[in-house]
Amino acid sequence: DTENLELEDILKNLLDEAVSRGLIEDSVVYRDLFDTKLMNCLLPRPAQIQREFKEKYDISPEEATKYYYKLSQDSDYIRRYRVKKDMKWTVDSPYGVIDITVNLSKPEKDPKAIAAAKNAKQSSYPKCQLCMENEGYAGRINHPARQNHRIMPIEINGGKWGFQYSPYVYYNEHCIVFNGQH
């Protein structure tokens, strides 16, 4: 019965099959590169999602951001099952309440992936992990795949900016706005 399967389980089964067939190595890095590629096949193109976001935004900015946040989760860009592992608590201090977070959702590289990254051809594309070029990027051993990533273009004071949610969600609906130019 596949009706009640969670996305994590579906992807795990597909990844295990890919490993058993020798399509990918069995490491977090290679599994993440491959499942991101799979999820991209199920997503509409960026322009279609941007158009839908704008249509919703014209009616209700709140509904547009809800739509985009849910899409970021449903596309596995925000990996809910990893974010659940994060530790969060508050501490009273002389300066007020401090939020403490321990991010366990960002995958650690295994020794084989670290060695492979050292030997990998260096690339300056994308320029950084927070730029427009990441949208749809296939990734490599030393740069995460972003094929399932969709960025919403926005304008601030006449400038072009990108709006996205953080894949690691330090806080609820943690978003990032970055300049369209480096």
State the predicted function of each range.
Residues 1-182:
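Active-site microenvironments that recognize anionic phosphate/pyrophosphate groups
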